[in-house]
Structure formats: C-alpha cells, structure tokens
Amino acid sequence: MKNRHHAAKDEEAAKAYAEIIKAMNEQLEVLKEKIKEQTEKPNCKEGVKRLETIPAIGRMTAAVLFHHLTSSKFETSNKFAAFAGLSPQQKESGTSVRGKGKLTKFGNRKLRAVLFMPAMVAYRIRAFPDFIKRLEEKKKPKKVIIAALMRKLAVIAYHVHKKGGDYDPSRYKSA
C-alpha cells in the first residue's frame, strides 16, 4: 500500500491510499495490544519471558513460538523444526549425482516467516559465532546460514520451553 500511495498520480487515489494505510496501522496497533494482553496472562507470561531470553527473539516472536509449542505436542525438537518447515531435504536419485539440499516447504509457513527476522538479527549480531563461523568457512551462502539459524532458533525454543528454564548460552555455544 505504501508503494501505491507513493506512486499514485491522482490526488484522490493518494488520499484513499493514505486512509487505508492509516486504518491498517490502527488495526495493527490493536492486534499488538491484544497479543501483549494475552502474553501477560499468568498461563503465558512465564513461558513467553523464557523464550525472550533467546538471543534475537522478541515479544511477538516469543508469543508465536509459545502458541505453537503449547498448542501441539511435539516429541522432539526435530519434529518441531519439521512442523515449521525447517527440515533439510536431500535431493538424491538412484544413480544421479547428489543435488543441492534445501529446506522442505512442508509445515507452517507463518511460523517459518516469523523466525526469519530473528535469524537475520542473530546473524547480524553474531549470536552464535562458532556456528556462523563454521558455516562461513564451508563457503555457505548467507541465505543458507540464515535458514540454518532459523532452524537453530526453533530447536532452542523447543528445548527452552520443554526444560522450563531460561536460555543458557553455554549449552548452545558450539552447536
């Protein structure tokens, strides 16, 4: 909408876009306030706070992760990562040369999307320096490293939620 507002040649169209943008921003603020209210409830507050101790995970991401971790029973962190669509997929065929691997696109697209920005932040602030350095030494592209960080954040969130304690950097230092 902002692009359309900026590119509008007609004054009335620009005014209509401005009103739509204003209404959407107001709705966004209402939704953020509702999420904040939900995360302040006693049954959510502690779990969300624990998830916020993970580097690069903010309130909104923690709320989404908490929702998915509590609404479904995952037996392992790998199953949670698969649910988020963050499992690596190997491309192999009988006699062919092994193809490039990729992430499966199965799973919850929204959960995968929510983990993208925290992974970008984790990359930028070097939240997991040994992990990032190891991937960079293998000449992995930045997007591959971001995807690996998304999976790592999902796995850490699972363990923080399951164990019931805060994030412990020494536990995930070299992984």
Give the role of each language-model region:
Residues 59, 63-142, 174:
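Phosphate-backbone recognition surface of nucleic-acid-processing proteins
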Residues 12, 16-19, 23-26, 30, ...:
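Generic recognition of short, well-ordered alpha-helical interface segments
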Residues 1-50:
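Long, charge-rich intrinsically disordered scaffolds of nucleic-acid metabolism proteins
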Residues 18, 48, 52, 59-66:
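Short, well-structured alpha-helical segments
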Residues 2, 25, 116-119, 150-161:
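Short, amphipathic alpha-helical segments that act as regulatory/interfacial helices
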Residues 126-175:
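Acidic, carboxylate-rich catalytic segments that either coordinate divalent cations
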